[in-house]
């Protein structure tokens, strides 16, 4: 038996290693076309503070414009320091971070599916976990996370929000206060990363209420009047850790009221610290909205409901927003894409039917089952609601809700994989005598081989698990070409216009001659400035490329004719550019200094 168990563990470790490598390779492949070759907008603005402040001043500024995100700022400072002048590395950094998140999702999905420790279900559990991670990586919602330096903000917030969900799920599964405290820690960090996740606070009270109801149910089930009916020979000797109910229906936490009270107060304490620190640093308790807007001034119930329904549509594969936010709308998508999205709905519907049928056949709806389903549903709903109250809806905010929906499917599979018998949930401090003979009975049934492994699936459930897993894989197979199609239209998203322009600007200047031959040795001149580049860009654009963070005097200047060039400007110390098309530049230095004809320029 020990040899068999060791072999199974070896296979489990091997399959896990293969899955992690596959996720890494898939993440690098799916994002191979995305690059950051220069900083602009909020990316450059944030870097400008890094360029002139130390770690503590950057992380804990005395005054902000309405946001207070010390944890994100600390990680962002470390990112700037780590990458240094290698601006091209930002996109790869974002990709690797997203891969790391997919690893967390992979393990979370395996935990939810409850299959990887079952010999007959290990392959299903590994496959579903891998599929969930891949669906996360290939989602077109990842555009901002990969193609912008501030994608770190969204990725970090998504990761911490999912870890909060994981901690609460483990707590509701009876893994004790440690899981709850881990969830509180992640919640503390996530609200100091992105303010909108304060909306997750009610989930803690849902978890505590569910655990209370579960323990109260156990108290009634294993009351003394019922335990007295158990044969004395099957009762173990009493121990100091044994906790019994005094009367049927009594409070299971009579000996741990202080712990329960602390669990209720801890989320409130975290919120008090959050709002108090905002009052001190930002000058107001209520977080600001998108682009510095005041939520209380811009909020519209009709608009918020519209954004909420739009996010639900996004989760189900329908790009209901404008193309400048999602790349291509559902109405403008190809017919075959619309057909595949319809097939994905069919897969989801069949999975839901299987899940409901499995729960119904179980015959009992426990507080734990209700609470855990509400945990996922409320998590998705709260994430949707918190991102629907501002002035616009961007797909980057849908990413966390979509990922939670994928994990919810893994949870459904895990519930189907459980046997038809409802396993008694053990409270954190409850050790009843009645649970022992029941567990002994379970062991004897398992040993007899009538129903498979101890924690395995009943034979009558194997077909349902297989069917659900195949439907999940079918959903992934159907959505893969859809996501690829959406990714092909990334260039229509609003921030890609400016990113392509600054990438082209870097290509024509510092990347063309090398930083050592450019910084401090050349000046850049741009005709007309139709792209309306600001003076801030002109001053700071090349500083991130300089290890000293100064740019060594190289800046951008705007001219309307060659006559505006300085008298000492030559082709050796100057690069003259002109906007080309709608999102790029071309080098016209030779034409400006009379070394080539203007007619030789390519047409826009």
Question: What role is predicted for each listed range?
Answer:
Residues 390-423, 438:
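Hydrophobic/aromatic-rich transmembrane helices and adjacent perimembrane loops
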Residues 40-81, 86, 271, 275-354:
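Membrane-lumen/periplasm interface segments of multi-pass, membrane-embedded glycan/lipid transferases
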Residues 92-120, 163-167, 350-358:
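Transmembrane-helix motifs of polytopic, lipid-linked glycan transferases
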Residues 156, 161-180, 190, 215-218:
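Membrane-interface transmembrane helices that cradle and orient dolichyl/undecaprenyl
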Residues 105-139, 158-159:
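Transmembrane-helix signature of polytopic, membrane-embedded enzymes
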Residues 241, 416-484:
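Signature aromatic-anchored transmembrane alpha helix within multi-pass, membrane-resident enzymes
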Residues 471-553:
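Membrane-embedded, lumen/periplasm-facing catalytic core of multi-pass transferases
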Residues 199-271, 276:
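Perimembrane helix-loop-helix junctions
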């Amino acid at each position: 038996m020990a040899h068999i168990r060791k072999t199974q563990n070896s296979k489990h470790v091997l399959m896990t290693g293969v899955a992690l490598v596959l996720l890494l390779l898939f993440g690098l492949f799916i994002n191979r076309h995305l690059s950051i070759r220069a900083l602009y907008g909020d990316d450059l603005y944030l870097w400008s503070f890094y360029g002139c402040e130390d770690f503590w001043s950057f992380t804990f500024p005395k005054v902000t414009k309405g946001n207070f995100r010390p944890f994100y700022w600390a990680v962002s400072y470390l990112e700037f320091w780590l990458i240094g002048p290698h601006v091209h590395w930002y996109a790869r950094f974002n990709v690797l971070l997203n891969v790391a998140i997919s690893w967390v999702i992979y393990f979370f999905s395996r935990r939810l599916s409850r299959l990887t420790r079952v010999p007959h279900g290990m392959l299903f559990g590994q496959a579903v976990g891998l599929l969930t991670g891949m669906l996360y990586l290939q989602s077109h919602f990842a555009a901002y996370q990969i193609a912008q330096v501030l994608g770190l903000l969204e990725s970090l917030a998504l990761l911490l929000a999912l870890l909060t969900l994981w901690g609460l799920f483990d707590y509701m599964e009876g893994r004790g206060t440690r899981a709850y405290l881990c969830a509180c820690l992640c919640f503390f960090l996530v609200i100091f990363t992105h303010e909108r996740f304060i909306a997750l606070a009610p989930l803690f009270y849902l978890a505590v209420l569910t655990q209370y109801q579960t323990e109260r149910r156990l108290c009634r089930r294993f009351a003394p009047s019922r335990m007295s009916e158990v044969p004395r020979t099957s009762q173990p000797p009493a121990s100091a850790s044994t906790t019994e109910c005094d009367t049927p229906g009594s409070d299971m936490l009579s000996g741990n009221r202080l712990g329960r009270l602390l669990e209720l107060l801890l989320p409130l304490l975290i919120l008090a610290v959050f709002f108090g620190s905002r009052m001190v640093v930002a000058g107001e308790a209520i977080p600001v909205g998108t682009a510095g807007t005041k939520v209380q001034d811009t909020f519209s119930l009709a608009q918020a409901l519209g954004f909420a329904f739009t996010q639900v549509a996004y989760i189900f594969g329908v790009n209901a927003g404008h193309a400048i936010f999602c790349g291509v709308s559902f109405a403008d998508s190809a017919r075959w894409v619309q057909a595949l999205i319809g097939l994905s709905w069919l897969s989801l519907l069949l999975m839901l039917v299987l899940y409901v049928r499995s729960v119904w056949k179980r015959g009992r709806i426990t507080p734990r089952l209700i609470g855990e389903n509400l945990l996922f549903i409320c998590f998705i709903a709260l994430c949707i609601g918190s991102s629907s109250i501002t002035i616009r809806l961007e797909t980057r905010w849908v990413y966390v809700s979509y990922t939670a929906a994928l994990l919810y499917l893994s949870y459904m599979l895990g519930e189907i994989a459980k046997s038809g018998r409802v396993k008694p949930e053990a409270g954190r401090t409850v050790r009843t005598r009645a649970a022992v003979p029941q567990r002994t009975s379970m062991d004897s049934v398992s040993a007899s081989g009538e129903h498979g492994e101890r924690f395995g699936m009943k034979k009558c459930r194997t077909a349902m698990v297989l069917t659900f897993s195949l439907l999940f894989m079918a959903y992934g197979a159907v959505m893969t070409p859809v996501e690829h199609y959406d990714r092909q239209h990334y260039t229509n998203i609003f921030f890609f216009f400016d990113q392509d322009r600054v990438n082209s600007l870097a290509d024509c200047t510092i990347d063309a001659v090398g930083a050592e031959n450019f910084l401090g040795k050349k000046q850049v001149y741009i005709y007309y400035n139709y792209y309306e580049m600001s003076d801030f860009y002109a001053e700071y654009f090349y500083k991130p490329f300089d290890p000293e963070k100064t740019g060594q005097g190289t800046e951008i200047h705007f001219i309307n004719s060659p006559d505006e060039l300085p008298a000492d400007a030559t082709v050796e110390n100057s690069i003259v550019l002109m906007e080309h098309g709608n999102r790029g530049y071309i080098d016209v230095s030779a034409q400006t200094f009379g070394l080539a004809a203007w007619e030789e320029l390519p047409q826009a």
